[in-house]
């Protein structure tokens, strides 16, 4: 909204001489979210998966081709027993995957607080020439119905399925099968097992931060006498 100058009175003053400050009240946050959602065609009165389906359905009046083109795998949740599954990778991300991860290194990690809905997000990343992380693919899926904890709503099978779809997507139309040689994860055995299922010869490394965290937590337990 700053770039589009849509805040109140922003279009009426001289930017070179303006000395203006905006005071945001607690009530402004919800109003800004509503304006943002409306400007992006998000209907907050319906479930998020229904918004997504409207964007990728060519027959929907809310169809958005750029979103449809960025999704290489989509499974709607039509019944309570099913999961919503969305795999996202733009053309630029596909090119980066071949440049930075094929016959090289990939990083896989998950996060569980991406929104108020019970959704899990796993991100595949590569490392560029400057040593910075580059997103290669996003794997978004819902927790099973009745699952009490979102962070426990996944297993080796669902990760294997989504990683295999990513591999198939990247390898389509090419003479070479997409294959990273090394993967870095945290200590989650489900992530590590799924990677080995899709690429049996891959070398698995532990993230140094998570490894140090495990050692620290275990040391605290031992020193506190809580380890039996």
Where is each model-derived feature located?
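DNA-binding interface regions
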Residues: 1-228
């Amino acid at each position: 909204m700053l770039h589009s100058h849509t805040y109140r009175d922003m279009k009426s003053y001289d930017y070179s001489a303006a000395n203006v400050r905006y005071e945001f009240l607690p009530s402004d946050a919800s109003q800004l979210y509503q304006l943002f959602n409306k400007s992006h065609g998000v209907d907050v009165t319906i479930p998020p998966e229904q918004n997504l389906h409207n964007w990728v359905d060519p027959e929907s009046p809310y169809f958005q081709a750029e979103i449809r083109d960025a999704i290489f795998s989509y499974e709607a949740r039509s019944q309570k027993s099913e999961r919503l599954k969305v795999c996202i990778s733009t053309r630029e991300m596909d090119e980066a995957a071949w440049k930075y991860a094929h016959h090289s290194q990939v990083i896989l990690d998950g996060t569980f607080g991406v929104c108020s809905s019970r959704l899990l997000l796993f991100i595949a990343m590569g490392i560029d020439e400057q040593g910075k992380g580059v997103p290669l693919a996003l794997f978004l899926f819902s927790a099973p119905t009745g699952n009490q904890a979102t962070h426990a709503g996944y297993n080796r099978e669902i990760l294997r399925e989504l990683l295999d779809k990513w591999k198939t997507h990247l390898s389509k139309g090419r003479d070479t099968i997409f294959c990273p040689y090394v993967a870095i994860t945290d200590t989650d055995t489900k992530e590590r097992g799924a990677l080995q299922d899709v690429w049996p010869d891959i070398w698995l490394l532990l993230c140094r931060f998570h490894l140090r965290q495990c050692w620290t937590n275990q040391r605290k337990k031992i020193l506190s006498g809580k380890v039996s």
